[in-house]
Amino acid sequence: GEAMLPHSITRRRAAGRDGPEESAALDRLGWDAAPEECWTPEARIKGQARDGMMAEILYTSFCMIAMNIKDSDLAMACMRVFNDYAAEFIAYDKKRLIGVGACVTDDVPQAVEEIERIARLGMRGVMLPVTLAEGDSYADPKLDPVWAAITETGLVVSLHAGTSRAGINPKPADWPQLYAGVHYLIQRVLTDMIFTGVFDRFPGLRIVSVENDVSWLPHYAYRMDHFAE
């Protein structure tokens, strides 16, 4: 439900409509060229009917950027604002508009409070940053209250490519390496959580890996088994 495309993408795709004419219109008209379903739930449902879709899982683009804000309080404030917006959007039809909230975990009590609020708002999942702030790790038991809150509320954790509390400001020459190695970050998170017993302590915890590819899974599973043996 949120329209926020990087400038490089707007030149290639005009809010979901391919073609040079549409791209030129978006460059000329700005967001006035974007279809109404980008911000109106009523139009979004009509778009689903047009495209033969039963439902959509709605992710944030804004929070992927806001998670890079170093100031913890400001970053969390951005998460709250988005969660309020998303809750209002999905309220139109929660069966067909499935919301995923967003949260940062720098301050564990604040994170637990926001996770519980996300569940009360009717969301089905919560997006956490794949890369935490410097010095923090998903292997740290201090995050157990976060996993407990997520498990108790029935939310699903979404680990989306490109989400970081460590800051992302790569030089142009860095992009090929970052793009080719995007799966490494999610592997690191899963490895930390598996070998430190997070899933043993919270067997109901569910994780979704989003836009991190899947072809690496067989080899990753082999390497994990090899290490465990």
Stretches found by the model and what they are:
Residues G1-E229:
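Helix-coil boundary/capping segments in enzymes
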